[in-house]
Amino acid sequence: MTQLKLKIELLSDTMIGSGDGYGAVIDSDVVYDEVGIPFIPARRIKGCLRDSALQVVERLNFANINLFSEDDVKNIFGKKGAKFSADIRFDNLFISDYEKTKAVFSYLIKNKKDDFSIDSIINSFTNIRRNTEIEKGIAKEHSLRTMRVLNKGISFEGEVAIDSSNDNSNFLIALAAMNLKRIGSKRTRGLGEIKCYIDDTSLNKKAIDFIELNAKGGAN
């Protein structure tokens, strides 16, 4: 089994939706834990990386660099929508020093109630966006929607476990991570730009070298 660390840096405000609102104040809220610290669910990032891996395969095959196939993606990630994957498992992605930070915030919420609350903590990581639906150049009546988004600049990290020790599987995961440029909702409106990578410089370099070597070989 191979253990890797996946990192994501938010290059723009990002909407990792929980599927719920927040009372009558927010129509679409982000995912956060019991003390107000945001995170990226494992299942969400698995789906994004699976789609990114398929895109990598498609682009390489289009360039006649036939190193990976859709079957490789299925073997690594399992069938789309399945709860458990074939060869890979993800942890939720949390901020750095998550457990220590959570313990501090839990203490402050309990002992400094006048200054700290779950709301104040989640507000420190987020901001509010409002938008309306436009119809024929005019704001549509009753279309105002409010959503909470994660602030640009937050970084997340989590463990990735790959059952296969095959170098090609590790290379495809590394390439899929580097290829992933946006996550979350409202990506066509400028949200969700990210930098995603496996925190292993050697693996990333080997993956790129593997592509370049085979590209040169295919050109000869």
Regions found by a protein language model. Name each.
Residues N127-G137:
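Short amphipathic alpha-helix segments
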